[in-house]
């Protein structure tokens, strides 16, 4: 114990002893004055000074610009949620997860890979809509032809049309949310507020994704039931049927070109 205490005291003295550091300079022999090679007029790179201050606006234009900047930053922060809920990503990600579970695959493909596949399929499906937003909203705003408010309205139109197009054949969810908001029955797309359209679109996408998932599960459930009955008839009760049925599911999925059929039907469902 005393030995450990002495070691701690020794290292503590080393840490707290002041160390004098001498700069390297060239001193002629026999003199105490020296010359350094550094240029006295040369300044080292400095970190720029950034000042965040609150001041009173001089004109109404300053107030409007501050509000616009705040709205723009808010939209950037919620952009991932908008991508998830207002595009085809929601349906694609849910269906791909259903496929993974129906094939009894636990780790392959990973969730990050499925999300990446859903993301790029979303870009492929939404590319015409994004092109309209770029041509009608972003490009004129960047060139100074329109303001932020008009750019927002122009960007909103293609997204509203895409969401309404998916529910045009079955507008039940739109009517439900309109009734919950105590609004009259809409006759056209212009009569539906954006917040109601987004809520109805989310519910519609969840419904469609689960319907597709049920149809995907049916053939694989039949394989599980056949394998389980065969194992029970052979007396192999302790053997998990999932381990035996998974290779047969993969063989069936590969033989019918499952990925090609799945992606093709998903793409057609958005047309």
UniProtKB/Swiss-Prot annotation:
<keyword id="KW-0813">Transport</keyword>
<keyword id="KW-0653">Protein transport</keyword>
<dbReference type="GO" id="GO:0005886">
    <property type="term" value="C:plasma membrane"/>
</dbReference>
<keyword id="KW-1005">Bacterial flagellum biogenesis</keyword>
<comment type="similarity">
    <text>Belongs to the FliP/MopC/SpaP family.</text>
</comment>
<dbReference type="InterPro" id="IPR005837">
    <property type="entry name" value="FliP"/>
</dbReference>
<protein>
    <recommendedName>
        <fullName>Flagellar biosynthetic protein FliP</fullName>
    </recommendedName>
</protein>
<comment type="function">
    <text>Plays a role in the flagellum-specific transport system.</text>
</comment>
<keyword id="KW-1133">Transmembrane helix</keyword>
<feature type="transmembrane region" description="Helical">
    <location>
        <begin position="5"/>
        <end position="25"/>
    </location>
</feature>
<dbReference type="InterPro" id="IPR005838">
    <property type="entry name" value="T3SS_IM_P"/>
</dbReference>
<dbReference type="GO" id="GO:0009425">
    <property type="term" value="C:bacterial-type flagellum basal body"/>
</dbReference>
<keyword id="KW-0975">Bacterial flagellum</keyword>
<feature type="transmembrane region" description="Helical">
    <location>
        <begin position="212"/>
        <end position="232"/>
    </location>
</feature>
<keyword id="KW-0472">Membrane</keyword>
<feature type="transmembrane region" description="Helical">
    <location>
        <begin position="190"/>
        <end position="210"/>
    </location>
</feature>
<dbReference type="GO" id="GO:0044781">
    <property type="term" value="P:bacterial-type flagellum organization"/>
</dbReference>
<dbReference type="Pfam" id="PF00813">
    <property type="entry name" value="FliP"/>
</dbReference>
<feature type="transmembrane region" description="Helical">
    <location>
        <begin position="70"/>
        <end position="90"/>
    </location>
</feature>
<keyword id="KW-1006">Bacterial flagellum protein export</keyword>
<feature type="transmembrane region" description="Helical">
    <location>
        <begin position="244"/>
        <end position="264"/>
    </location>
</feature>
<keyword id="KW-1003">Cell membrane</keyword>
<dbReference type="GO" id="GO:0009306">
    <property type="term" value="P:protein secretion"/>
</dbReference>
<keyword id="KW-0812">Transmembrane</keyword>
<feature type="transmembrane region" description="Helical">
    <location>
        <begin position="113"/>
        <end position="133"/>
    </location>
</feature>
């Amino acid at each position: 114990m005393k030995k450990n205490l002495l070691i701690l005291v020794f290292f503590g003295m080393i840490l707290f002893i002041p160390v004098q550091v001498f700069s390297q300079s060239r001193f002629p022999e026999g003199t105490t004055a020296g010359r350094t090679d550094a240029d006295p007029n040369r300044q080292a790179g400095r970190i720029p000074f950034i000042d965040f201050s609150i001041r009173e606006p001089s004109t109404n234009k300053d107030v409007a610009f501050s509000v616009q900047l705040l709205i723009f930053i808010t939209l950037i922060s919620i952009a991932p949620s908008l991508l998830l809920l207002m595009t085809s990503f929601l349906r694609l990600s849910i269906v791909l997860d259903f496929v993974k579970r129906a094939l009894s695959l636990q780790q392959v493909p990973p969730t990050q890979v499925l999300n990446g596949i859903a993301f790029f399929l979303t870009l492929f499906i939404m590319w015409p809509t994004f092109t309209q937003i770029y041509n009608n909203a972003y490009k004129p705003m960047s060139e100074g032809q329109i303001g932020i408010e008009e750019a927002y309205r122009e960007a909103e139109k293609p997204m509203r049309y895409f969401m309404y197009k998916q529910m045009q054949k079955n507008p039940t969810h739109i009517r439900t949310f309109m009734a919950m908001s105590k609004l009259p029955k809409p006759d056209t797309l212009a009569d539906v507020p954006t917040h109601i359209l987004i809520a109805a679109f989310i519910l519609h996408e969840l419904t469609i994704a689960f319907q597709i998932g049920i149809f995907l599960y049916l053939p694989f459930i039949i394989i599980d039931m056949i394998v389980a009955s065969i194992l029970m008839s052979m007396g192999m009760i302790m053997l998990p049927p999932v381990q035996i049925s998974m290779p047969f599911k993969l063989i069936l999925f590969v033989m019918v070109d499952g990925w090609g059929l799945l992606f093709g039907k998903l793409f057609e469902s958005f047309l």
